Amino acid sequence: KGSFYHYYSGKDELLASLPEIFDAKYEEVMQALDPEMDSFDKLMTLCFSVHDLIESDIPVGLLASLYSSQVVTKGDKHLLNQNRFYYKMVNQLVDEGQRRGQITRSMPYYEIAHMYALCERAIIYDYCISDGGYALGEYTRKTMPLLFGGVRVKQEVK
């Protein structure tokens, strides 16, 4: 067993804890953000921060196990649990961005929030099937704004 397993009774318990680790990072970053910051930029900053954490602290094999368990599992889908801080935070930020005129209102906030989560998962899935063969944080900084940028409202230059 790897050193990661030392703190857990088994792989299932370890995998179930990963979304909690991600959410703790989201909460930490969220508290440090300027409330006046553009909502789209908040979403990007949160994504970049957690992807940096994943790259530095989470073994890619463990991450791949989490993702594959969510596909084949009939039981708990910890990653997709809508009661997670992550989903509440994303919904809140998209709603805030729509109210501020920073994120399109052409779709309901919950559909845009779902698209955001889908984009994040797509990048992580690619990282897993590439066996962690690239710098996740750097790749996310290039890719996420392109994947999700269509919902951003173009701001007038003052």
Cite the ranges covered by each PLM segment:
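Hydrophobic alpha-helical connector segments
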Residues: 17, 21, 31-57, 109-116, ...
